Amino acid sequence: MSRVAKNPVKLPAGVEVKFAGQQLSVKGAKGTLELNVHSSVEVTEESGELRFVARNGDQQARAMAGTTRALVNNMVQGVSQGFERKLQLVGVGYKAQAKGTVLNLALGFSHPVDYELPAGITAETPSQTDILIKGIDKQLVGQVAAEIRDFRPPEPYKGKGVRYADEVVRRKEAKKK
């Protein structure tokens, strides 16, 4: 059995789980998320905990049990607390402004960059150089943050660009004459 799948997922108060065949639905205060469970994984609920067991003992089934447990744990955490990712803009004239479902970015190009936020994701700009991406789907929050960072990744000489708040940019020394 997978070491990850051995640990059950505890369901906090206010989180509801429903099974419909291989479809698993997690509903909480912040919204609802769904997951198609692999056919080799059996999910059971007992006394406020979800347990994941591989139907047969082969390596693929054990791996899928651990993966499913991690995904469901992220879903439970997302619908109860939510996820957020913070980005920083470093550079002269680099600005961000959130307008509804559009994030307007000035990143030193000859044109502004307008990024359309997907459904279920919100963006806040506490200051012109900080962006806060929030949502209940961990994968989608990370994907949106990565797409925004890809517009202008931090460069190694001056460190200018869009970076994660906890990212350490490795700097290079300028070429010597």
Curated annotation (Swiss-Prot):
InterPro entries: Ribosomal_uL6-like, Ribosomal_uL6-like_a/b-dom_sf, Ribosomal_uL6_a/b-dom, Ribosomal_uL6_bac-type, Ribosomal_uL6_CS. GO terms for biological process: cytoplasmic translation. It holds the Pfam family Ribosomal_L6. One of its GO terms (molecular function) is rRNA binding. The keyword rRNA-binding applies. One of its GO terms (cellular component) is cytosolic large ribosomal subunit. Coiled coil: none annotated. It comes from the Bacteria. Keywords: Ribonucleoprotein, Ribosomal protein, RNA-binding, rRNA-binding. The keyword Magnesium does not apply. Belongs to the universal ribosomal protein uL6 family. This protein binds to the 23S rRNA, and is important in its secondary structure. It is located near the subunit interface in the base of the L7/L12 stalk, and near the tRNA binding site of the peptidyltransferase center. Part of the 50S ribosomal subunit. This is Large ribosomal subunit protein uL6. The gene is rplF.
